[in-house]
């Protein structure tokens, strides 16, 4: 009899403990769901494998964490790639991709939207604000080469007003050319090469306006920038300037087309260039060195992402984006490719290696 009573009490105790565990689990799930109710959307202008996009995305998550917002715990994140550099390249296609992103915003109802590069700013953020002026979804942009105050919803860089702020992208050309001069002291001329994409046109225009027309102490004489449409034209120009320049400046190379009109994969462009040109290359984005060019000094995607992520955290905390000035955060990275330097029989100076943010040992990228 006594053992029966003991057994019954033991079963009751186990039942109570199990019930408590269930309640605790449900509370934990509920709390987790409640804490991650915030929804964030990131819209990239280009494709998923574009190195800049990957760096920006990682930086955003890091920047938000520095403001106390942890992915999955405090917010859910969704990403949309417009893919306007390789796949959807006509004006009509770019606009259609913008509409898809806007539809996603309507369905997802994010608390904050990050838009990366000029297409996403124009065709998503600005288009959304102009179409739905009474909504207050905040937008934070990055990778913007033009002056965003040309758009009506942005009053000025100092006081944007409305629901939009972000980071300008201003390439540090002078620093990049100085790096080239440091590595190859005898160099006096650099030829700049670019593909025909709209983003390249922005970069070329900005370079002429902000560098050629204003800088009087350039460490190198500039040839170009030269924009070419096809891979064959790229090859011809590269060979033409083997004796006319001392350095090759890499702006862009992702929309060169073959005889059939198809985009030539970037690794193919890099591979041909490094095996047929004797000009040391200086790129303007870190992943140019990762792909195989000798050196790069440019705006850091990761650090830019951290910057706008911190801005995003500030906005989630209650600050109006319209009160946050739009600036160039002036965050750069230096990168080298040692295999390419070895091919050119160039020794990267120790003081430059010390300053490098990343050094790649081999030619070739895993980002495509």
State each model region's role.
Residues 2-10, 28-368:
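Short hydrophobic alpha-helices and adjacent helix-cap/hinge residues
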Residues 15-27:
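Bacterial N-terminal signal peptides
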């Amino acid at each position: 009899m006594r053992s029966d009573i003991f057994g019954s009490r033991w079963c009751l105790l186990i039942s109570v403990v199990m019930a408590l565990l269930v309640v605790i689990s449900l509370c934990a799930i509920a709390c987790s769901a409640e804490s991650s109710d915030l929804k964030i959307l990131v819209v990239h202008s280009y494709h998923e494998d574009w190195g800049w996009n990957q760096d920006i995305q990682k930086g955003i998550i890091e920047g938000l964490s520095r403001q106390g917002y942890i992915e999955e715990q405090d917010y859910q994140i969704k990403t949309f790639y417009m893919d306007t550099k390789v796949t959807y390249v006509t004006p009509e296609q770019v606009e259609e991709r913008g509409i898809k992103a806007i539809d996603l915003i309507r369905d997802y109802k994010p608390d904050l939207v990050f838009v990366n590069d000029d297409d996403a700013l124009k065709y998503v953020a600005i288009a959304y604000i102009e179409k739905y002026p009474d909504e207050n979804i905040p937008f934070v942009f990055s990778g913007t080469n033009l002056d965003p105050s040309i758009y009506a919803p942005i009053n000025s860089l100092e006081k944007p007003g409305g629901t939009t702020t972000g980071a300008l992208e201003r390439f540090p050309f002078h620093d990049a050319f100085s790096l080239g001069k440091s590595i190859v002291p005898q160099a006096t001329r650099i030829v700049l090469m670019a593909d025909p994409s709209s983003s390249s046109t922005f970069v070329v225009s900005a370079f002429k306006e902000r560098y050629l027309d204003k800088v009087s102490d350039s460490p190198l004489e500039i040839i170009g920038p030269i924009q070419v449409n096809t891979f064959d034209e790229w090859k011809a120009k590269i060979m033409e300037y083997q004796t006319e320049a001392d350095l090759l400046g890499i702006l862009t190379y992702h929309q060169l087309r073959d005889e059939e009109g198809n985009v030539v994969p970037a690794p193919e462009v890099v591979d041909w260039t490094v095996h047929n040109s004797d000009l040391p290359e200086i790129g303007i984005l870190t992943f140019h060195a990762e792909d195989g060019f000798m050196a790069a000094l440019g705006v850091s995607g990761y650090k830019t992402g951290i910057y706008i992520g911190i801005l995003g955290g500030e906005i989630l905390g209650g600050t109006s984006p319209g009160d946050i000035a739009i600036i160039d955060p002036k965050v750069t990275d230096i990168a080298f490719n040692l295999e390419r330097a070895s091919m050119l029989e160039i020794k990267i100076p120790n003081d430059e290696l010390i300053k490098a943010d990343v050094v790649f040992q081999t030619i070739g990228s895993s980002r495509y």
